[in-house]
């Protein structure tokens, strides 16, 4: 009986030790950090999957996996991870934004617009509203785009965000967000055949940034009755 008790105790101790070992994520974290230092995203992702498996469905490391996929431009996997995270906590704005950008990069423009629409409600961020207006404009939903761009104008601007425009094959221009919003508003008004309003919006964009090449070209196009340049 004593021998049996010792054997059973040893077995229970082994099981307890094994459970601690399998649930210990410190080694996985070390491997992940080392992999990231060496630029090996595949190993880093594998380590994160091990951590998530040990922590369970609510693992906070799913956020890290989403960021890893996003930074690696693996937008399909990023979208899937973000969807899983948001099914448990729909208030994570950075995760919502990554989901929206992933959809846009995958060419699912209307679905991306739906996600941005949810994000704008939560963030009250004028850049998010601008992105929403741009996506609606891309799929020719001009009324929805106009409402979104007017919302973008109403929201607070930090003055920190720039939008990049391709002026030509060799030159990109950084433009203040408020100027970009006014230019987009002019484009929408042009498509709605509101030429005087379009001129006013393009002029406003130039007032906000005097060297805004595309806005200048669009204003001149409206004056001359020509086609404007799209975003």
Model-flagged regions — what are they?
Residues 33, 67, 101, 134-135, ...:
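Residue-level recognition of tetratricopeptide repeat
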Residues 37-38, 71-72, 105-106, 138-139, ...:
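Register position in tetratricopeptide repeats
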Residues 18-64, 80:
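N-terminal leader/linker segments that initiate helical-solenoid repeat arrays
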Residues 64, 98-101, 131, 165, ...:
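Canonical tetratricopeptide repeat
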Residues 56, 90, 123-124, 157, ...:
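Short coil turns that delineate tetratricopeptide repeat
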Residues 172-231:
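Terminal, low-structured helical/coil segments at or just beyond the last alpha-helical repeat
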